[in-house]
Amino acid sequence: MGGGNLHSLPPENASVSASYAVTVGNTKLSDAPVLFFVYCHKAFRAQLVELRRFATDAAEADSFSGDLAVELSRKFEFLKLVYKYHSAAEDEVIFLALDKRVKNIVSNYSLEHAGTDDLFTSIFHWLHVLEEEIGSRSDVLREVILCIGTIQSSICQHMLKEERQVFPLLIEKFSFREQASLVWQFICSVPVMVLEDFLPWMISHLSHEEKIEVENCIKDVAPNEDSLQQVISSWLLDDSQSSCGTPTEIMKGVQYVNVSKSLKKSPESHPSSGCFQRFWEWSKKSLSIPNVGRSPIHGLRLFQNAIEKDLRDIQEGLCQAKFQTLILDLDVLMARLNFLADVLVSYSNAFKKFFHPVLEEMTARRSSTAKQFNIDDCLENFQRLLYKSADDKTKTDNFLLQLQEELESLIIQVTKQFAIQRTEVFPIISKNCNHEMQKQLLYTSIHVLPLGLLKCVILWFSAHLSEEESQSILHFLSLEDSSPKKSFPRLLLQWLRFGYSGKTSVERFWKQLDVMFKVRCSCQKEHTEEASGSFSNQTQLQLCKVSKDVYPRKKDKSSTCFMSMDLAVGDMYETPYSSRMNQQMTFSGKLKPPLHLPDFFGEKNMDDPMIMDVKPIDLLFFFHKAMKMDLDYLVCGSTRLAADFRFLAEFQQRFHMIKFLYQIHSDAEDEIAFPALEAKGQLKNISHSFSIDHELETKHFDKVSFILNEMSELNMLVSTINTTAADHDRKMKYERLCLSLREICKSMHKLLSEHIQHEETELWGLFRNCFSIEEQEKIIGCMLGRISGEILQDMIPWLMESLTSDEQLAAMSLWRQATRKTMFVEWLTEWYNGHVLQEEAGEANNDPFGDSDPLEIVWKYLFEASADGEKGSMRSSLLKLPKTNFTGIMNQPPPNYKVEVGKKEEKDLERSESKKICRGSNQEGDKEQTDKMSQKVSQFGPSKKYEQLLTMSEEELVVVIKKISCDSSLDPQKKDYIKQNLLMSRWNISQRTYNLEPSSLSSNMETVHGQHPSYRDPHSLIFGCNHYKRNCKLLAPCCDKLFTCIRCHDEEADHSVDRKQITKMMCMKCLLIQPIGANCSNTSCKSSMGKYFCKICKLYDDERKIYHCPYCNLCRVGKGLGIDYFHCMKCNACMSRTLVEHVCREKCLEDNCPICHEYIFTSSSPVKALPCGHLMHSTCFQEYTCSHYTCPVCSKSLGDMQVYFKMLDALLAEEKMPDEYSNKTQVILCNDCGRKGNAPYHWLYHKCTTCGSYNSRLL
């Protein structure tokens, strides 16, 4: 109901599900551990397909209820969670490592990660509407399915791009050990509660063979520590029940605890895993268990004391760090601060997820203490300041003072929070929860920490415990039996014992932390200095170097990567974690520094290009604005099509224009703008991601074209069939096509909008800052030089329609500036004036009959087609004409304009007969009069038959107009049209008679010189001349003569004709002189004057491929700009696309040939471009090079003359100079390299000592 199956789309080149296998080649996971993330991609794809099928099946079965909406919402919650951790791992682990080796690759992918939150927000909104049963359920279901499709297309395209570009580079640039360390760092950076659900969920979507590969991969990348390996195996191999839920349970929907209805009103307190539900259910059962020993919640007091003590120690250390003697300890202090910030963030999360809802339940929401737990704002500000510590330059006295102030503020907030918890929270929990429930609460809270951070916390915490306190914690962990698996508690117990044993001192612990955070800082600094051109990249290799350089591993890559004998259990290098990854998850990217947008934006709106100094490259982003508006049009138009199929033709026409213009823009960026940007040294690879976007987005356009074609065919069928069962089926198919179209248009809107936004964010400033004004003009000129005049006639109005008046002025100013050395303004003026006149004429005419002759319409209505029942009855009463067929009149041969004209008595006779017919007199002779009139009409032609309208009196006109008004066969628009043209018929006939006067006079002499056909091939009777094949002649206004073409005129006359002044032509079939046009205006002729017609150049041709260049403002022979030619804006010349790389010389065509002195710009002869940049005719070049090898203008060599120069060397070697000249030298200037030098004396040949050329002259 309302959902329906989406219509089948055109087949792809390769299935998306198998794309990962194609993009990364035949590499196996056992050879490249980093492909673990590609297997995650496969799980995401499978999950999205499953969710889409779930929604569509429920919609088709009309079984979509509020409960199903809740279930689907929970599935998407889990998908959002694991995808965000996956994205954070790529941003903060994979991408940073890759950017260390290959610059400018990953920044765009990080931007794409940031755009996924909006996708999930939209689907959650519509699922909530569906759950609350707001509005029409069918409409909401459609929106849900559309949102799922948008999420699917966006995420899948992003993953496909990564598989095509990022992962092949990771495999190429990183060794097996380095890849393994990156995968393990990701696993150690994910909270345990998420990891326990994520790994079983992931492998549940893989085949049996792939599942085994993933299991072996994770075991290989993990350290060879028995307890840790057992934990990993328990997460992977048990597919019946994990500690935090099975994959099956997850996909059925993670059931949050139904503690009270109030929890639903506080979604921020909901965990994203099933741990919370099982904790609560277990804790309810454990209330009856008696309390034994000390309260487990006392351990949190110890934990808080350790945090406060370390914060105070660091505060004292910072006070001493401003002295130069202790500045070396600052790095260790900063590492300790980063670690404690991570601990506080995890501690705060645990309270929000577990302690907060428990406390609210116990106090029946009467306590306000729960709301005082949040110190996120303070932590966020503090961690943002810690980011500045990555650059050593910021560690000045001012920075230290600011850090001390923030730390003091943090200590105050933390102390207050801990005090509230000790006095209000812990007593309530101790009073209302038995020891077993407290143990479960603490144990479950541990799962909030990532595995790597958890180990660091246990080692750090154990160093702060006394012997009695340590024994208490050890006893707590040894008695832990709430979990169905014992491996994880045993691992925690092992880590705690190691820390308590003292094998890892506090000093060593802090040094190891210092190494982890110091590597990050140095990488960030190096990246800032070396790759400042990329906005959002920050690089690090946290573990790769450390693990490779410090700790040896087995050489066999298929074996375990770590050797337990070489690594102590307590070393943190075993379990590295990325604190940035969890910070990104916790604070949703708020800690990241803002993108390095171009300086010209300042504090103003970056969407408004008029706030800045406009530069040539901004023309691209004016185009972006127009494209974004058209994307909105596609979304709105696809929605409208479901209700109005008549809108299909307009939508299809607009879509094809958008597709065509987008393809032109994308090709220009890929082939011109992006290569120019990457040619800058430090910006290599920065645009490849956008080129992949262009390729993939083309497929979306093709899908829309495919659907629109099917809708067009279906629309014709629907419109011609009555309401039947077949018609109903077609209607349902049309609705499904509309839904598919809406989905793709929404996906395109999302993908292209983000693509454009990322281009502007990442590349706009680079184009503006890295290129000078001249270089930007060259880039824009190269892009515009590929666009033909016909496309510009569509593009310019389309672009101007989307811009404000100020933006229009700016855009056209940039356009004119980039083309200032060409004739573009002249072409624009001529085209625009004609375009406006044509539009005004069209608006004024508003012809409901199309382009038909208005007099012909009136004539046919009054005097012809009497076989028509309704119209014939009216005409019989008006004109008393019998039912005579005049349909063959317009097909008669062209009349002979030299006879039957000028005979006054016959004209008078015809007029009198017409009057009698119109007045209805002499009814008995109607047939004879009609036959006689038809004969006269066939002799006089169309222009004379209309003169019968001149004989109608005013009374007759009134009668005719009343009858027209009563004619039910005409719609109101046609009635007004016929009445208006009937009233204007006298003026129209007089004007037409005046225009035809020169060709209508009867004379044995030609009225206009040349008013006769001319033939290109007299034997085959092919019209034209030696220059062109065409069916018309041009009337030269300068001498009032007809010539076949302008070149014929210039050859015969002693002057040149101005093509702009030519306004009339003569059709060589009917010899009618008429205004310039593509076809003959004679209604009995209407012949085409030529396959090619240029209104600007007044050029007709019927055999060659010709195009009008808007920058030359001339017609050129060729297929067109962007096909086989382009226009160089500096040279102001159309050149073959093979000459993209050439020597530019300003307006080189606007000169005479140096040999024959003909003006090259308007010459029709082929032109040869010389290496020096000068031009000459090809025929002149062939003749000239028979005796010369230097340019006649600049004297440079016309080519590679090394063979000739070697011949001269051999010739001079055989010559013997007289003794008096043997030691003499001459000063020469080389014409090729332009350098001066000394050459041995010779009467003719002088060799340049620099380049070896003999093309030189004496000074």
From Swiss-Prot:
Pathway: Protein modification; protein ubiquitination
Binding site for Zn(2+) 2: C1038, C1039, H1049, H1055
Zinc finger (RING-type): 1153-1195
GO biological process, one term: regulation of iron ion transport
Single GO molecular function: ubiquitin protein ligase activity
A Gene Ontology cellular-component term: nucleus
Annotated binding of Zn(2+) 6, by residue: C1128, C1131, H1142, C1144
Annotated membrane topology: Single-pass membrane protein
Chain intervals annotated as zinc finger (CTCHY-type): 1089-1152
PROSITE patterns hit by this protein: ZF_CHY, ZF_CTCHY, ZF_RING_2
Record-marked site positions (Required for iron-dependent instability): E90
Region Disordered, annotated ranges: 904-938
Entry binding sites for Zn(2+) 3: C1067, C1070, C1080, C1085
Name of the protein in its database record: Zinc finger protein BRUTUS-like At1g74770
UniProt organism field: Arabidopsis thaliana (Mouse-ear cress)
